[in-house]
Regions:
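FAD-binding core/adjacent interface of flavoenzyme oxidoreductases
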Residues: 1-5, 73-139, 213-215, 237-241, ...
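Beta1-alpha1 glycine-rich phosphate/pyrophosphate-binding loop at the start
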Residues: 4-60, 65, 140-146, 150-174
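Glycine-rich nucleotide phosphate-binding loop and flanking beta-alpha elements
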Residues: 13, 110, 151, 207, ...
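Glycine/Thr-rich phosphate-binding loops of Rossmann-like dinucleotide-binding domains
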Residues: 37-38, 112-113, 153, 209, ...
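Short loop/helix-cap segments at secondary-structure boundaries that form the rim of catalytic
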Residues: 39-40, 114-119, 135-137, 173-180
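A Rossmann-like FAD-binding core segment of flavoenzymes
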Residues: 63-85, 89-91, 97, 160-236, ...
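FAD-site-proximal beta/loop scaffold in flavoenzymes
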Residues: 114, 120-136, 217-260, 265, ...
């Protein structure tokens, strides 16, 4: 059987690997970290963990599980995917892998702005997921950091729970509708004692905020998709219910396809993509 190469070893990629390798496929998973999940601390909305589970522990357990079943984990990044004589050529800085099928599961890359203090307050006011953490900021004042459609989308999620939300574009011109409340000043730093308390701007002024939701840029999978000629909608890869793209042998799962950016959904996507990629390989 031809090899299956999975790009991304977050929940979607590892879930796909578990199903494919158990079905007899040789599987290589390429990734540098656990994706967007690495920005989380305690996961409190995942089935079976009544007291929550640390994101780091969940990522590491999934990787060990896949390795124990025989999947190869390659810590690297994908430079490109090309069409080979039979199948695909997946290029990394160190090697080129031949694959009969490929699953793109790198998720949506989140660009972290270079703002002093942003790392200090991750988990203490700074969040990367509105739908995950909006609940904890009810009755408080929060900012969304970003200037595009992703920032506007996170704003709408937050406004369903929080009344006081402002988008801070960090000096960039917004591409979302001007009717959304926003501030275009360049951000100098985040400040606070034990948690985020204020945003200080480059002009010396400041504004109090209890939380900041980072929503800069968009997808990492998008560039791979466009180079391959995959159909996209916005910054998402278009798939059918089998997580198959418009190119036979290429599948996509997780945050890079439409739907909620949640662990449970990513695991489900991976299951579907892994089983369907296995069927595809067996048909070759």
């Amino acid at each position: 059987m031809e090899q299956l190469v999975i790009i991304g070893h977050g929940p979607a990629g590892i879930s796909a690997a578990l199903y494919a390798v158990r079905g007899g496929a040789p599987v290589t998973v390429i990734g540098k970290d656990g994706g967007a999940l690495t920005k989380a601390d305690l996961i409190q909305n995942y089935y079976g963990f009544e007291h929550g589970v640390k994101a780091k522990d969940l990522i590491e357990a999934g990787i060990r599980q896949a390795q124990n079943l025989g999947a190869r984990l390659l810590t690297s990044e994908v430079c490109g995917i090309e069409f080979g004589e039979a199948g695909f050529l997946v290029k990394t800085p160190a090697e080129v892998l031949r694959a009969g099928a490929v699953i793109i599961a790198v998720g949506t890359a989140r660009n972290v702005p270079k703002i002093e203090g942003i790392g200090q307050f991750e988990g203490s006011g700074v969040s990367y997921c509105a739908i995950c953490d909006a609940f904890f900021f009810r009755g408080k004042k929060v900012a969304v950091i970003g200037s595009g459609a992703y920032a506007a989308s996170e704003y709408e999620v937050l406004k369903g729970v929080i009344s006081d939300v402002t988008i801070l574009t960090d000096g960039a011109e917004p591409t979302f509708t001007a009717s959304l409340p926003h501030n275009k000043k360049k951000i100098a730093r985040f400040e606070g004692a034990n948690a985020l308390e204020r945003v200080v701007f480059a002009d010396g002024t400041s504004e109090a905020f209890d939380g900041a939701f980072i929503a800069c840029g968009s997808a990492g999978a998008f560039e791979l998709a466009k180079k391959l000629g995959l159909e996209t909608a916005g910054n998402k890869i278009v798939t059918d219910e089998k997580r198959a793209t418009n190119i036979p042998g290429i599948f996509a799962a997780g945050d890079c396809v439409a739907g909620l950016q949640q662990i449970a959904k990513a695991v489900y996507d991976g299951m579907i993509a892994g089983t369907e990629a296995l069927k595809y390989l067996k048909s070759l």
